[in-house]
């Protein structure tokens, strides 16, 4: 007995058997088999080998293998010599190339495979990895060229410096534009550059530099596209973004004053609390505001000595007379291993930055910036890592910015009530504390877009806590228009305050957490602010990177966040638990040491059952915590 020259009917019959053998749960597989059977019935021509079915739409290698098994069993039962069909790998290798593969690339690939693979391994060809080359005028292309232009090879540069230069090399905006709903900028291409080892990221705040492969590729792109950098053949000037750490020597307050020929300045006792005193007065009364400002001006003029004169220059430095003041603003020194710059008063301008989410309404998103502009007050809008309004100082020579010691958190009454209810209020309060800003304001707008329910007492308690216990200041306004008036009045005070101050701007290179951010700031304040006339602050880039919600969590912060995932655990309860059990491992070990399940369920209750106020743990909550951690 021999097989027919056309086994189409047998294949259709076996496909039906495959359909009948499926369970009700294999609905998708049933649809695939029925589709294959239907297409085979409508197909023209003869089908002898199972591999001949490959040309039928809906029949792939899996179905062919199952039909091949059935054909072999059929031949065995009927004592027919088995069909020697060509292998699937040989069949697939003879198929025409895909549309996306050019004929030239197919020839090259086949030649390489013939050279590198043994004959028996031709069926398992390895896909060759292509070298990553960013598309012309793309984000990655612009970042590479800007890094090369900034000479970011021996030392890295910041994200802001890259973005400032990269715009001319890209067809896309490097930063998000929230007003046009462009939530992602071309800067996101940095991830691909790091993945392919073209750019190196290091330090906190982050610094970016080119690797050897990155330098080679970028120079090739520059040559291929005929790009020339503006100052390619010039010597690096005094404002060069890449600085040599070896030229930075250690200088404390005494050394700094000796270098600039300054005398020891008496401490201005009233100067620290001046801004806080102004806050609680009627800021909407210009005459009263001016009287206080110029009264403070007279006090300062009697005690402070001008910081603009540079009387002595070391022998190894040659500074032109016309550039004395500008040169002094960019000298970088070190204290406790941290770099800093001295900005003399008059060498920087002060203005507020408003968070892009601070709007009057959905239809009037730029209300505050336009209102400040009408009052002749410069402002910027960008995404802030912390706070709704911060004041910055921008160096007129270098363009670098630093965060001043004033931050405002704006809340409507209904938003404040919601933030208390979902624990955002305490979380924001803690982050504001870690910012190190001396003047922290809660600006409360007494307008509501919703009902606050039974939150009156909670609102009073929360506001009293931040005013009395945490020493925050509060500004109350009736609406957005009055908010503009109060912010403008506060800006007047801040601008005058810093018109007679020199700034020590800190440039740390390796901060691990928000606690380190504040620790470094306090160290500088203890050294440089003890004689008055100088104020210390971090650069804006450092503030933006370290004060965000999601980055640089310590083990303790992670423990608190995990504990708050248990329903019923507020921030206060989580902090109380973390003080006793510093890490999650300590919690797990505490449950393992319990002698019985009943003891484990009451572990947290026995520890914090008598804790005061919001830190108290009830028996039911203690059992919930056991269910989450005690059964692991």
UniProtKB/Swiss-Prot annotation:
It is found in: Nucleus. InterPro entries: DNA_pol_lamdba_lyase_dom_sf (IPR027421), EME1/EME2_C (IPR042530), ERCC4_domain (IPR006166), Mus81 (IPR033309), Restrct_endonuc-II-like (IPR011335), WH-like_DNA-bd_sf (IPR036388), WH_MUS81 (IPR047417), XPF_nuclease_Mus81 (IPR047416). Its EC number is 3.1.22.-. The active site is at residue 415. Its main location: nucleus. Optimum pH is 8.0 for the cleavage of a 3'-flap structure. Coiled coil: none annotated. One of its GO terms (biological process) is DNA damage response. Residues 109-129 are annotated as: Disordered. Its cofactor is Mg(2+); Mn(2+). GO terms for cellular component: Holliday junction resolvase complex; nucleus. Residues 527-632 are annotated as: Interaction with MMS4. Interacts with MMS4 to form a DNA structure-specific endonuclease with substrate preference for branched DNA structures with a 5'-end at the branch nick. Typical substrates include 3'-flap structures, D-loops, replication forks with regressed leading strands and nicked Holliday junctions. Cleavage probably occurs approximately half a helical turn upstream of the free 5'-end in these structures. Interacts with MMS4 and RAD54. Two distinct classes of meiotic crossovers have been demonstrated in budding yeast. Class I crossovers exhibit crossover interference and require MSH4 and MSH5 for their resolution, while class II crossovers exhibit no crossover interference and require MUS81 and MMS4. While class I crossovers represent the majority of crossovers in S.cerevisiae, they are virtually absent in S.pombe, which lacks orthologs of MSH4 and MSH5. Present with 300 molecules/cell in log phase SD medium. This is Crossover junction endonuclease MUS81. It comes from Saccharomyces cerevisiae (strain ATCC 204508 / S288c).
């Amino acid at each position: 007995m021999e097989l027919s020259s056309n086994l189409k009917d047998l294949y259709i019959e076996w496909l039906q058997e495959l359909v009948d053998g499926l369970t009700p749960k294999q609905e998708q597989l049933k649809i695939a088999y029925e589709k294959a059977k239907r297409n085979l019935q409508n197909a023209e021509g003869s089908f002898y080998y199972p591999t001949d079915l490959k040309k039928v739409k809906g029949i792939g290698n899996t179905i062919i293998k199952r039909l091949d098994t059935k054909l072999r069993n059929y031949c065995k039962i009927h004592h027919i010599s088995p069909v020697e069909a060509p292998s699937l790998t040989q069949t697939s290798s003879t198929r025409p190339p895909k549309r996306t593969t050019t004929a030239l690339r197919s020839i090259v690939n086949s030649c390489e495979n013939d050279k590198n693979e043994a004959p028996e391994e031709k069926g398992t060809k390895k896909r060759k990895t292509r070298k990553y080359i960013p598309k012309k005028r793309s984000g990655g292309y612009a970042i590479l060229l800007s890094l090369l232009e900034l000479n970011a090879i021996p030392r890295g540069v910041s994200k802001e410096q890259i973005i400032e230069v990269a715009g001319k090399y890209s067809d896309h905006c490097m930063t998000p534009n929230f007003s046009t709903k462009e939530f992602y900028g071309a800067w996101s291409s940095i991830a691909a550059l790091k993945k392919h080892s073209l750019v190196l990221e290091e330090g906190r705040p982050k610094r970016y530099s080119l690797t050897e492969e990155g330098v080679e590729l970028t120079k090739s792109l520059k040559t291929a596209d005929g790009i020339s950098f503006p100052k390619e053949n010039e010597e690096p000037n005094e404002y060069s973004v890449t600085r040599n750490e070896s030229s930075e020597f250690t200088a404390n307050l005494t050394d700094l004053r000796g270098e600039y020929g300054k005398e020891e300045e008496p401490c201005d006792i009233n100067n620290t609390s001046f801004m806080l005193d102004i806050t609680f007065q009627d800021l909407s009364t210009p005459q009263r505001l001016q009287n206080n400002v110029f009264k403070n001006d007279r006090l300062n003029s009697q005690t402070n000595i001008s910081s603009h004169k540079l009387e002595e220059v070391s022998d190894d430095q040659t500074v032109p007379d016309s550039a004395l003041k500008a040169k002094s603003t960019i000298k970088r020194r070190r204290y406790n291993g941290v770099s800093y710059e001295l900005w003399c008063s008059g060498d920087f301008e002060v203005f507020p930055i408003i968070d892009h989410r601070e709007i009057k309404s959905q239809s009037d998103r730029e209300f505050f910036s336009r209102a400040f502009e009408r009052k002749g007050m410069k402002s910027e809008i960008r995404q802030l890592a912390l706070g709704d309004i911060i004041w910055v100082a921008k160096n007129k020579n270098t363009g670098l910015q630093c965060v001043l010691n004033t931050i405002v958190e704006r809340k409507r009454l209904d938003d404040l009530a919601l933030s208390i209810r979902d624990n955002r209020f305490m979380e924001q309060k803690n982050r504001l504390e870690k910012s190190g800003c001396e003047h922290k304001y809660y600006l409360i707008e007494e307008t509501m877009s919703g009902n606050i329910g039974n939150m009156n007492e909670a609102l009073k308690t929360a506001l009293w806590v931040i005013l009395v216990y945490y020493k925050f200041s509060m500004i109350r306004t009736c609406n957005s228009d009055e908010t503009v008036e109060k912010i403008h009045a506060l800006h007047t005070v801040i601008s005058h305050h810093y018109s007679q101050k020199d700034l020590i701007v800190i440039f740390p290179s390796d901060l691990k957490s928000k606690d380190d951010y504040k620790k470094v700031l306090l160290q500088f304040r203890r050294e440089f602010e003890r004689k008055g006339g100088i104020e210390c602050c971090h650069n804006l880039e450092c503030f933006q990177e370290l004060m965000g919600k999601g980055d640089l969590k310590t083990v303790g912060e992670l423990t608190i966040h995990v504990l708050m995932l248990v329903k019923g655990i507020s921030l206060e309860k989580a902090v109380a638990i973390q003080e006793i059990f510093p890490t999650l491992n300590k919690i797990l070990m505490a449950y393992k040491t319990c002698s019985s399940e009943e003891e484990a369920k009451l572990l947290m209750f026995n520890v914090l059952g008598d804790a005061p106020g919001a830190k108290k743990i009830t028996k039911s909550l203690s059992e919930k915590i056991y269910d989450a951690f005690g059964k692991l």
